[in-house]
Amino acid sequence: MPNITNNHTFNIVQLSDLHLTGDIGQAPSYQRFLAVFQTAKHLNPDLWLLTGDLVNDGNSDAYDWLFNQLQATKIPYLAVAGNHDVTHEIGIHLAHQERIHVPILPDRRLKNCFRYTFQAGHDWQILLLNSSVSGEIFGLLTHETLLWLDQTLTTHFEQTIIALHHHPTKVSSDWIDAHLLKNHQDFWHVIKKHAHVHTILCGHVHQVHTLHPLPAHQVQLLSCPSTDRQFMPFVDNFQIADTPAGCRMIQIDNKGIVSSYIQIVQNTHSFCLNNAN
């Protein structure tokens, strides 16, 4: 179990919605990721946490490239699937409702029903859930996954962070809220029973949100910017936002106090130009 010493924090860097596609290591999505990743390395992470939509077309070579980048840092990493990791989207130049979605198998290195523990003032656990559905954009947690979550929280009382791809609460954007976690009420029914759930991390929305969905519960829901492109928040129809890529830092000090901030990277476009050879 990783542990922190006095006057240090346990630092989790959340990376999400990479959408790696095109020439491996060279295409713009790779270069934008590398710009964010190089910045994130200087944040002294103790864990890389990737919350889905890593690769756009299921290319195993793209996953190999990504996981080689992570392994080279010698820092532990965890990753869950997003809808694009289990769905090949054909016709990306078309309107969303006109695209064809073909089911694909997830990479075997993506986690589901996985428990990771560390110490930071108190004992902590991170629970990874697969919310992706092959051939679909929306999310769903299977009965077996919800049962595992409930049983794990019942038998392990560590302070808990849960990571999944799909947002389990609406974010006031109609088009992306149509593709949230479909059985979110079942998910929250489990969470309500367990006061030691502290933070839920998600991707999918390409937006930054801090929400408190359960007024009588301490739990906070944090979403993460994409390392690729951002979606315009608080609009009913799909729009790309002219805002920087980035990642989320979650810090837990030796008193068990959690803080978080967004690290943005302004020069991803310049990074693409400088490395597109």
UniProtKB/Swiss-Prot annotation:
InterPro entries in alphabetical order: Calcineurin-like_PHP_ApaH, CNP_phosphodiesterase-III, Metallo-depent_PP-like
EC number of this enzyme: 3.1.4.-
Cofactor(s) this protein cannot do without: Fe(2+)
Binding residue positions for AMP: 19, 53, 83-84, 206
Any Pfam family hit: Metallophos
Cofactor binding note of this UniProt entry: Binds 2 Fe(2+) ions per subunit.
Signal peptide: none
GO MF annotation terms: 3',5'-cyclic-AMP phosphodiesterase activity; metal ion binding; nucleotide binding
S-S bridge residues: none
List of residues binding Fe cation 1: 17, 19, 53, 206
Record keywords, A-Z: Hydrolase, Iron, Metal-binding, Nucleotide-binding
Positions that bind Fe cation 2: 53, 83, 165, 204
Matches recorded under PANTHER family: CYCLIC NUCLEOTIDE PHOSPHODIESTERASE CBUA0032-RELATED (PTHR42988:SF2), PHOSPHOHYDROLASE (PTHR42988)
Family stated for the protein in its record: Belongs to the cyclic nucleotide phosphodiesterase class-III family.
Protein name as it appears in the record: Probable cyclic nucleotide phosphodiesterase MCR_0369
Organism encoding this protein: Moraxella catarrhalis (strain BBH18)
